[in-house]
Amino acid sequence: MGLVCSRNRRYRDSDPEENAQAAEIERRIESETKAEKHIQKLLLLGAGESGKSTIFKQIKLLFQTGFDEAELRSYTPVIFANVYQTIKVLHDGAKELAQNDLNSAKYVISDESKDIGEKLSEIGSRLDYPHLTKDLAKEIETLWEDAAIQETYARGNELQVPDCTKYFMENLQRLSDANYVPTKGDVLYARVRTTGVVEIQFSPVGENKRSGEVYRLFDVGGQRNERRKWIHLFEGVTAVIFCAAISEYDQTLFEDESKNRLMETKELFEWILKQPCFEKTSFMLFLNKFDIFEKKILNVPLNVCEWFKDYQPVSSGKQEIEHAYEFVKKKFEELYFQSSAPDRVDRVFKIYRTTALDQKVVKKTFKLVDETLRRRNLFEAGLL
């Protein structure tokens, strides 16, 4: 509407400078509007802890200039917070198990570590965390290596223990160095809940050159209280990239410990599929955290999740991993085709096996996504 008005406006002959400025502004607006039409919007959605924000960070590393030193340093307090919060969760979890579990003895923290544990638990309760010094790192290492804490860590799925735990606990001496600057790997493991909306613009890199497509990717808060903020992004979206952490079939939500994470993911996926504004939107489903899934499935049966209660294991080892993965994949396919006819050509649906922390996997996946969306665009233009 603004463009139409500006084109019809008569410039005053008495002020050539003002006329020139107005004409330049009009040219810029028109240019930006045309450029915007060529940018495809991707909406990155998923429940909390699905790994979508790690995907977002990988895009920045893969298809942009990455993180400069200032950005890397900005993650230092986040990483320290992850360390302190995690060791507190493990300490407090061990104490609870020592009181209530049938095998309570193995969760009793050793006398040598008790005082350290209480100190670190208190630090983990603060609003402001101290700088991670060598002395504090040594104390955290001592508690981490305690047998009771290791037994508790083995039951991390019951205690909201984050996926980054082992990585940071094994790098404490480096993290506590006086001149510490987070690495790209540290940033990828750093856990901070997305609130609100963040965006990034990129063009995927193929084997020989950049794709001709330009994408704007929006990452939206995954926790329940963030979802009401999504609605203004829905219109005009080329595709939804939905992240589902398939390894979390035996875990509960951070914000509601009575709710299984995969059940929440199922319900969220169903809800998104039913939104009228996604009637013709393509869906790229990332079955994420496969690296954790393939280890867990050999020890924790898939049917502990209500959604997968009809699952029947077939064997062990790699064959069982693939069988379980295909079962989960089929469940998501069934959800999708409940809302979309299988023979529809105006709405693309693809499923990808992903590990957000694996840069090669993410790069390959986005190359495939790019190819899929480019083919869809050619089809819509009548060129296929």
UniProtKB/Swiss-Prot annotation:
| Annotated ranges, domain G-alpha | 38-384
State the Gene Ontology terms under molecular function: G protein-coupled receptor binding; G-protein beta/gamma-subunit complex binding; GTP binding; GTPase activity; metal ion binding
* Keyword field contains GTP-binding: yes
Decide whether keyword GTP-binding is in the record: yes
Q: Which GO terms describe its biological process?
A: adenylate cyclase-modulating G protein-coupled receptor signaling pathway
Q: Where does the record place the region G4 motif?
A: 284-291
UniProt region (G1 motif), positions on chain: 41-54
Cofactor(s) this protein cannot do without: Mg(2+)
Instruction: Choose one Gene Ontology CC annotation of this protein and give it.
Output: heterotrimeric G-protein complex
Provide the binding site for GTP. Answer: 49-54, 163, 188-189, 194, 222, 288-289, 291, 356
Q: Where is this region: G5 motif?
A: 354-359
Q: Where is this region: G2 motif?
A: 186-194
| S-palmitoyl cysteine lipid sites | C5
Q: Per the record, which residues fall in region G3 motif?
A: 215-224
Could you list the residues that carry lipid attachment of the N-myristoyl glycine kind. G2
Keywords, in A-Z order: GTP-binding, Hydrolase, Lipoprotein, Magnesium, Metal-binding, Myristate, Nucleotide-binding, Palmitate, Transducer
Q: Where does Mg(2+) bind?
A: S53, T194
Q: Where is this region: Disordered?
A: 1-23
Q: Which family does it belong to?
A: Belongs to the G-alpha family.
Q: Which PANTHER family match?
A: GTP-BINDING PROTEIN ALPHA SUBUNIT, GUANINE NUCLEOTIDE-BINDING PROTEIN ALPHA-5 SUBUNIT
Domain remark from Swiss-Prot or TrEMBL: The helical domain (69-189) is required for self-activation.
Stated role: Guanine nucleotide-binding proteins (G proteins) are involved as modulators or transducers in various transmembrane signaling systems.
**Subunit notes for this chain?**
G proteins are composed of 3 units; alpha, beta and gamma. The alpha chain contains the guanine nucleotide binding site.
**What is the protein name for this chain?**
Guanine nucleotide-binding protein alpha-2 subunit
Q: Which gene encodes it?
A: GPA2
